[in-house]
């Protein structure tokens, strides 16, 4: 009887699970409008609450809203909203927990007038202990950002690129400032009369006109996402007294000056000094990455004092509790490599001090992660290395074989102890005041990201937020299958297979090979809307980490130096072969796509094999030489190529997809951001498109106005949706036979001849024959 009862209970549970699954729906591309993201978590000094930025989609304005929320670390209550602005970011608790400073960008009433800038972000103060409205306490012409409280709570340091000329112009436009200036000006002598005669403008009628002409003198003059760089406005460190009420008339003071920007900064424990890093080189393109550490007196200002030099590019810097040491992450400069693992370093703040590498024997990436398409699209914040209260340990995230977890590093022994574990990606972390506990933002393949509280025991963390649970409880999502396979040379390659939620191994499915960019990056155990939606549309998605990927060790990452693309292509094809062996993929219905380096490899794939029925290359590269001349960073050092294209043109020709354009018969879609300065369309998709149109091959170009290289991750919401629709629509047409009127004008593919009728006139060296 008991056995029958147990069996009946099991049947009921199974039936309930089937019923619950039947109530769920498939994910759609438009679900992004309901997504919420968490960014920049900050733990209160008493460890009781976490302030964070909640990012949501404003579908009416096709943009993102950011507001500051908080949640208890007890995990027993829902988050509550703290600020009411549309663009509030960078929350920072005062040392006593009574105040919260944050950055607010005013809502623009429309496009700025010619010659003017949009409203600048300013610092605001929110009384937490007493409640009440926030108030603005900076008003700099070019705004303020990156606030940081002094440990004694009296001052707030921040960054601004406002310069004296900006302040003078602001005073000129402000009637109150002009009146104050007149009141303070020296009075005329009784024997002197003011000159009232009209005077012509100093330089003619256009004296006040601001030219929009750019005069370029530096190698790097624009950056993806940031636009054209203004070297006349270096970023400097300012301080302001922390106001106690909206009536306090506090005056910001500029601490650093000159033509060089300051990078990361940190307060000394006694609140007397601010330490910062800077690279005082006119054009860093010619130099190996490096930085100097300076200190400036916070109250008195004066000339900064140079403390030490670092012959690397430090990031995530953090001062020790006693203020005598500096911890940071950096990659060594030499030998010059395509990829060098970042390590964790510590050094004394003293002249001639040398950094010590704590992770020299740890063959994985420190201060690194894995990539999906749902990182916080705005106000994500950054991480710094965390010190233990006794100064004996450091904490940072490491990336290991597609996983990203928080680790503890013992400074004396270099022993490494996991703080978090599992198939996941820790995307942000913050410590309590004593570093006994950590608030971590964790993403998994079925969760965009939530806050958890973890302690140093390594036990399972406690979930604090459920920011997308209402939506995700309605969705039928599937977990990816992890696989390892052998490539052509016996090297093990790591990959994942995302299957449709109603997967049936007895059916035949179309497959999409998705290739990551970088090339030194990694897929992993993290949420990816694109993969989940492709699976929901009936595709099997294969996403591998071929050689050159991060999180698998130095040798695996750098093995493609001077050979990219090359053997990584073979890794990808071996992955497709591996999935075909499983029997549930139709070999005649294969698609391939990828972005950035993945777009380059997509172009390479269709120039070297005809096995794919369709391809979509995103933010791609067609010609390495053209990219060398136009990208937003330089390859002056011998990292990817041994020489510039005018000294060794053949190497660039051999490795450029455009060289093999006559081999391309696969229908190709090109996805381009018109403001992409990382892989400019003129060096990529535009070349592929024009060449294939000349050859009358099936090709289409989809252009996104105003979008940068980050289209898929942080572009305008509707553009992100349309991007997905076009990619999947292209595959629907060629892999599933669906009618797509928007692509009717595309020249249909012709049968591929048994042997290429028109091979390249001059076959490049090392060119590989098509399969």
Predicted features, each with a name:
Residues 281-282, 364, 458-459, 466-588, ...:
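Cap/lid segment of the alpha/beta-hydrolase catalytic domain
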Residues 93-179:
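Hydrophobic or amphipathic alpha-helical targeting/insertion segments
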Residues 35-50, 85-103, 133-135, 139-157, ...:
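Conserved beta-propeller blade repeats
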Residues 23-56, 60-62, 66-68:
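Mature N-terminal segment immediately following signal peptide/propeptide cleavage
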Residues 73-76, 128-131, 242-246, 297-301, ...:
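Short loop/turn segments that connect beta-strands within beta-propeller blades
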Residues 56-60, 106-111, 163-166, 281-284, ...:
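Short glycine/acidic-enriched loop and turn motifs that connect beta-strands
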Residues 65-66, 110-121, 161-247, 277, ...:
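Predominantly five- to eight-bladed beta-propeller fold
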Residues 530, 536-537, 543-771:
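Active-site-proximal cap/loop segments of hydrolase catalytic domains
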């Amino acid at each position: 009887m008991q056995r029958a009862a147990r069996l009946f209970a099991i049947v009921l549970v199974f039936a309930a699970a089937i019923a619950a699954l039947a109530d769920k729906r498939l994910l759609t591309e438009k679900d992004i409008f309901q997504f919420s993201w968490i960014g920049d978590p900050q733990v209160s000094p008493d460890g009781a609450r976490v302030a964070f930025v909640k990012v949501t989609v404003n579908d009416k304005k096709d943009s993102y809203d950011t507001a500051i929320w908080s949640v208890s670390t007890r995990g027993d209550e829902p988050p509550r909203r703290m600020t009411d602005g549309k663009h509030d970011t960078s929350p920072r608790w005062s040392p006593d927990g009574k105040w919260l400073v944050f950055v607010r960008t005013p809502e623009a009433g429309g496009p700025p007038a010619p010659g003017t800038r949009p409203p600048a972000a300013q610092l605001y103060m929110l009384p937490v202990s007493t409640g009440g409205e926030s108030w603005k306490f900076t008003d700099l012409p070019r705004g303020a950002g990156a606030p940081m409280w002094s440990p004694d709570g009296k001052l707030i340091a921040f960054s601004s690129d406002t310069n004296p000329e900006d302040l003078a112009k602001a005073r000129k436009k402000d009637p109150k400032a002009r009146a104050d200036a007149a009141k303070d000006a020296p009075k005329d002598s009784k024997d002197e009369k003011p000159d009232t005669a009209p005077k012509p403008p100093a330089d003619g009628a256009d004296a006040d006109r601001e030219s929009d002409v750019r005069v370029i003198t530096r190698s790097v003059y624009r950056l993806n996402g940031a636009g054209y760089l203004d070297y006349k406005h270096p970023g400097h460190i300012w301080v302001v007294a922390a106001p106690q009420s909206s009536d306090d008339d506090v005056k910001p003071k500029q601490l650093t000056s000159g033509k060089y920007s300051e990078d990361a900064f940190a307060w000394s424990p006694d609140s007397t000094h601010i330490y910062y890093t800077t690279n005082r080189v006119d054009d860093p393109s010619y130099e190996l990455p490096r930085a100097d550490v300076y200190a400036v007196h916070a109250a008195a200002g004066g000339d900064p004092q140079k403390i030490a030099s670092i012959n690397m590019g430090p990031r995530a810097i953090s001062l020790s509790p006693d203020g005598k040491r500096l911890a940071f992450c950096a990659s060594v400069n030499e030998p010059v490599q395509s990829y060098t693992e970042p390590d964790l370093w510590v050094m004394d703040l003293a002249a001639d001090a040398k950094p010590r590498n704590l992770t020299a024997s740890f063959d994985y990436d420190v201060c690194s992660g894995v990539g999906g398409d749902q990182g916080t699209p705005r106000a994500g914040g950054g991480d710094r290395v965390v010190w233990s209260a006794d100064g004996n340990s450091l904490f940072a995230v490491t990336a290991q074989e597609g996983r990203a977890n928080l680790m503890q590093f013992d400074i004396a022994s270099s022993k490494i102890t996991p703080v978090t574990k599992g198939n996941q990606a820790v995307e942000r972390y913050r410590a309590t005041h004593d570093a006994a506990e950590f608030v971590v933002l964790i993403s998994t393949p079925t969760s965009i990201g939530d806050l958890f509280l973890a302690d140093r025991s390594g036990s399972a963390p406690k979930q604090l937020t459920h920011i997308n649970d209402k939506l995700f409880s309605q969705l039928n999502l599937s977990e990816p299958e992890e696989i390892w396979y052998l490539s052509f040379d016996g090297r093990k390659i790591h990959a994942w297979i995302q299957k449709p939620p109603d997967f049936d191994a007895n059916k035949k499915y179309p497959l999409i090979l998705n290739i990551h960019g970088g090339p030194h990056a990694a897929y992993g155990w993290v949420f990816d809307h694109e993969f989940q939606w492709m699976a929901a549309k009936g595709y099997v998605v294969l996403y591998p980490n071929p050689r050159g990927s991060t999180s698998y060790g130095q040798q695996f990452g750098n093995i493609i130096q001077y050979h990219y693309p090359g053997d990584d292509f073979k890794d990808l094809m071996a992955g497709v072969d591996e999935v075909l062996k499983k029997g549930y993929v139709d070999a005649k219905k294969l698609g391939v796509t990828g972005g950035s380096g993945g777009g380059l490899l997509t172009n390479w794939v269709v120039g070297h094999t005809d096995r794919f029925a369709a391809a979509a290359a995103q933010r791609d590269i067609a010609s390495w030489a053209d990219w060398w001349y136009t990208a937003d960073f330089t390859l002056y050092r011998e990292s990817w190529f041994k020489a510039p294209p005018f000294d060794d043109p053949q190497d660039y020709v051999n490795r450029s997809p455009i060289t093999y354009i006559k081999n391309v018969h696969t229908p190709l879609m090109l996805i381009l951001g018109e403001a992409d300065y990382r892989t400019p369309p003129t060096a990529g998709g535009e070349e592929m498109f024009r060449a294939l149109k000349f050859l009358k091959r099936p090709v289409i170009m989809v252009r996104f106005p105003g979008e940068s290289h980050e289209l898929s991750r942080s572009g305008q919401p509707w553009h992100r949706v349309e991007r997905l629709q076009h990619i999947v629509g292209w595959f629907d047409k060629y892999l599933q036979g669906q009618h797509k009127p928007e692509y009717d004008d595309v020249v249909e593919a012709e049968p591929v001849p048994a042997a290429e009728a028109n091979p390249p006139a001059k076959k490049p060296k090392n060119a590989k024959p098509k399969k």
